[in-house]
Amino acid sequence: MSVRVGVNGFGRIGRVFARTALRDKDIEVVGVNDLADAKTLAHLLKHDSVHGGLKAEVTAKDGAIFVDGREIRVTAVKDPASLPWTELAVDVVIESTGVFRDTATASKHLQAGAKKVVITAPAKDPDVTIVLGVNEQAYDPKKHRILSNASCTTNCLATTVKVIDDAFGLRRGFATTVHAYTNDQPVHDFPHKDLRRARAAAVSMIPTTTGAATAVGLVLPKLKGKLDGIAIRVPTANVSVVDLVAELEKPVTIQAVNDAFREASAGRLRGILDTCEEELVSVDFNGNSHSSIVDLPSTALIEGNLVKVLAWYDNEWGYSSRLRDLVRFIGKTL
């Protein structure tokens, strides 16, 4: 029996998640809530500037989107507590507005009839934060109703760091994410509380903050306080890369580090972490569903235990693929 899903906020992540879910027989997207109308949302689902056209018939009629004949009810309700999740028999809500990121507000979906809520961002006081491949064993279906899927960068970094720490022990590290621009940046200069993010997204490299490195401690508690990082937003529409420099507990070789990633990608992290032997660039990873793709030719080492690792990630498709997988994971115990 498929998991019935409602999506609150049909922006970049909401729509890309829907694309991944439409391919999955175990998930049925039955409702979308967004302040835009059904015709506009259907158009944006069908035509995507980053991921191309959806290979399906997509239409809008009578307050609904139809994808190859499958109906997705569309509403435009501001208060999540008033959403028709009971009527639609929704099991899991994808909370992707970027607005309802704490337990108090996200729990309104539960009041509306949903069984579980997954917040598509780092959240304030969720029941649990899950990064698949890292700490899914922490999920307790009897206790946890509001989950965070962390961020795209945390999914990449935590997955990468776990391999290093498990194999060699991580003493401390610093991560720089070179990140594609996102919708919270303006096309032209425009006021923003972060003065650097106030600048035109497609013109400059923009240093800014990221909580991804410190958030690793939420899913790998033993590394709490051992990682920090920054972000540099760059003028590309999609695909990002984490540059991790870490001090290890014991001496290693480049071969040993790369072999650890090869082994993980072929084993316990298959489908979540991948490796790349070719000398590729960001556009080559557009549409890649992995949380982390380690760039093996770029691995570097100083004095035996200071290692540099580059890990690519499609910050839209890879992250949305983990959302899909998390919904399936939750669905097993509903």
Where are these regions (language model features)?
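Predominant activation on well-ordered alpha-helical scaffold segments within soluble catalytic domains
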Residues: 14, 18, 107, 158-165, ...
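Generic secondary-structure signature for well-ordered alpha-helical cores
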Residues: 22-26, 162-170, 180-183, 210, ...
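Acidic, glycine-rich segments within the central catalytic cores of soluble metabolic enzymes
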Residues: 166, 170-237
